Amino acid sequence: MSTFMAKKEALDRRWYVIDAAGKPLGKTAVAAATILRGKHRPEFTPHVDCGEFVIIINADKAVLTGKKLEQKYYCRHSGYIGGMKKIQYKNLMATKPEKAMELAVRRMLPDNTIGRKSMTRLKIYTGTEHKHEAQKPVAYNA
């Protein structure tokens, strides 16, 4: 008997909705990353993209515990001397709340082609409305 290997063509991709209102940012991001990667499926195969679609609503209402609202920074570097850019979490939430959720999920996925392909299946919205009702998404309790 040989080990089962999932084929990308044989997988059916379902849509899930995660409501981030009042939930910690990290726990919501973990649930989304697990679904995007496909690790919740019994036929998960590490080298095959078996993930599904995820819609995150109310991204602006995600919370952080402790003093992270004041102390958490997102950093990036241009590669040049003095090219460090830092933005405080509360400033990011004031301007682009969906970007904070996107960064949290992105950093939980692998840094390879499967991770980049998984990010294309992530849809983030600040309100309760989304434009994917035609796909009949299922509510996911994270």
Language-model segments: residues:
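Ribosome large-subunit tunnel/peptidyl-transferase-proximal elements
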Residues: 1-103, 109-113, 131-142
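Phosphate-binding beta-loop-alpha motif at adenosine-nucleotide cofactor sites
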Residues: 17-20, 121-125
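C-terminal folded domains that constitute the principal catalytic or ligand-binding module
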Residues: 115-118, 122, 128
